[in-house]
Amino acid sequence: MSILEDHAAPLRRALDELGGLDEPLRAAADSIVRSFRSGGKLLAAGNGGSAAEAQHLTGELIGRLHPARERQALPAVALHADTSTLTAVGNDYGFDQIFARQVEAIGRAEDVLLVLSTSGASQNLLSAVDAAVNRGMVTIGLLGRTVRPLHELCTHVLAAPTDSLQAIQECHLVLIHVLVEQVEDLLAGTDA
């Protein structure tokens, strides 16, 4: 087996099982669309590679997924992207509060918080979800298979069906693309 085949094996197995997430994916997309239609926005948060994927998600919503499908920009914010706020809050309140303080400042009941985590146990994401729940927000978790605290707190859970950290992140990217595609379909009225 080549090194690429070795790396791809757990991903291939996980991708084969992603079909089991159709219902939670549709429910998450529906919640996001309801938020947008009521004047809300999507807030996204993650750490490390998951932060990069959170920003990828917000870029797809503000931009577009399909070049042939023009649509309005959708309101989405990656909470890790404002480095001045991140470091100020981290310095004054601690790393565990870097996302929660932002949710407290800009989160509203009509908004959605989407968190990405391979561990499902990052304290700064748990604090952010708590802050979102206190505001009456819908929360979505793109997580790993192993049930951790975030699984219990999020309104919708899209759990990558693997224990491989790399495959979890790679599944999250697929889930992001499918989620944005579902949102675009619902907004365009073309969802089957």
Regions found by a protein language model. Name each.
Residues 50-55, 121-128:
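Short glycine/serine/threonine-rich phosphate/pyrophosphate-binding segments
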Residues 1-20:
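Generic N-terminal amphipathic, Lys/Arg-enriched alpha-helix
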Residues 17-38:
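A short, well-structured juxtamembrane/interface segment
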Residues 142-154:
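Short, glycine/polar-rich helix-capping loops at beta-to-alpha or helix-loop-helix junctions
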Residues 105, 167-192:
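A charged, well-structured terminal subsegment
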Residues 113, 139, 156-158:
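Short, well-ordered beta-strand core segments
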Residues 34-107:
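Glycine-rich, small/polar surface segments that engage phosphate groups of diverse ligands
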Residues 39, 110, 136-137:
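Glycine-centered short loops/turns at secondary-structure junctions
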